[in-house]
Amino acid sequence: MSIFKLMVIYFTLFWVVNAAQLLDLDSHGVIPGAYIVVMKNGVSSHQFSSHVRWLKRAHRRNLAKRVAPFTEGLSSTWDIAGWQAYSGSFDKDTIQEILNHENVEFVEPNREMKAASTIKQENITWGLARISHMENFSHDYVSTYGEGENLTFYGIDSGIDIHQSDFTGRARWGINVADHIDIDCIGHGTHTAGTVAGQSFGILKKASIVSVKVLDCYGHGDTTKYINGLNWAINDAKKRGLLGKSVMNISLGTGRSRAVNEATVRAQEAGIFISVAAGNNAINAEFLSPGSAPELCTVAASTRNDTRAYFSNYGALIDLFAPGEYIRSTLPHNRTGIMSGTSMAAPHVCGIGGLIMAAEGLAPEQVCRRLKELANPAIKYAGFNTTDKLLYNGSGA
């Protein structure tokens, strides 16, 4: 049964004379009247604070000067490793003033964000064996880089069942920016977390696990909620001294978004290795975010026979393939289940990336390059202009 599907949203760039860029989209997936505003590089914290005060005054003034539908105004502000932005609902006059402000780089609509996978109840598991052997059809998992001791995994997803016994007491609830239901209703986040850090199905078997819920019980979110979750995770890691010792998996996406790409890249630069799913639309990954950001490790899905899964996105932005078809992992309430998708492939890279980062003392932005050096050139029928590199953990097996 299909749970959710990545949306493909094409957008057109409009120019405003002597103003910031307005990145516009077609109506599909756009949340009417809701926007993300990104500041120019080099804007100071003081200038950002002054801009926010100006914005609040402009919003009140424009609402008061005529009869107009109410808009709530500012909802969130972010500073992710110097990337400063905010979101909110604004009327057209306020948006025009924002575009004309000297410190604004661009504005884009807030839009829906979803994850992608299918679930099948079948008794099969093979992913860990494949990524720890150069030859296919092995049946054991071999690792020479440990089990993720002293690492922390942040799952940006539908939430994680922190009481799942396979997490052996290592999981904690971080934040819920999606709804008011502090559980993983759909299982997607618990499944991806199990591949990264579960005892039975995971790679970082001794890592700490943190749930960051950005998708609601229908598997829906938006770019504002996503960036809110990302921002919280960076601040949590900084507060706890975990930067440089943390990994993050992002098995969700939306149409190509400059704001989503920039925020995610800055999060990695702050000190967290990030693995992202390429998407399940069987199209070029350049059309989706955050997988279209070349600085991130974008992961396509492979099959048991070392081919590209029929649903997986492809193209020059793919860094690695990893097992993504019929992957068994954890589900809420101490259950297990099989899911397929690039959502299932990316967690394999997240886990191995954490091991390599810790073992070799790499910066997060160096990890993907190292994984590609270790990778196994095994993928057949990868797709046009797409790598043949399959994730390998360097075990020597």
From Swiss-Prot:
Any one GO CC term of the record: extracellular region
Gene Ontology molecular function terms on file: serine-type endopeptidase activity
Span of the signal peptide: 1-19
Enzyme Commission number(s) from the entry: 3.4.21.-
Localization per Swiss-Prot or TrEMBL: Secreted
Propeptide span(s): 20-116
Sites where a glycan is attached: N123, N136, N150, N249, N305, N334, N385, N393
One GO BP annotation of this record: proteolysis
Leading EC class: hydrolase
Keywords of the record: Glycoprotein, Hydrolase, Protease, Secreted, Serine protease, Signal, Virulence, Zymogen
Domain Peptidase S8: 125-397
Gene3D superfamilies the record matches: Peptidase S8 propeptide/proteinase inhibitor I9 (3.30.70.80), Peptidase S8/S53 domain (3.40.50.200)
Record-annotated Inhibitor I9 domain positions: 35-115
Catalytic residues (UniProt): D157 (charge relay system), H188 (charge relay system), S343 (charge relay system)
CDD domains: Peptidases_S8_PCSK9_ProteinaseK_like
UniProt similarity note: Belongs to the peptidase S8 family.
UniProt function note: Secreted subtilisin-like serine protease with keratinolytic activity that contributes to pathogenicity.
Name of this protein: Subtilisin-like protease 12
Organism of origin: Arthroderma gypseum (strain ATCC MYA-4604 / CBS 118893) (Microsporum gypseum)
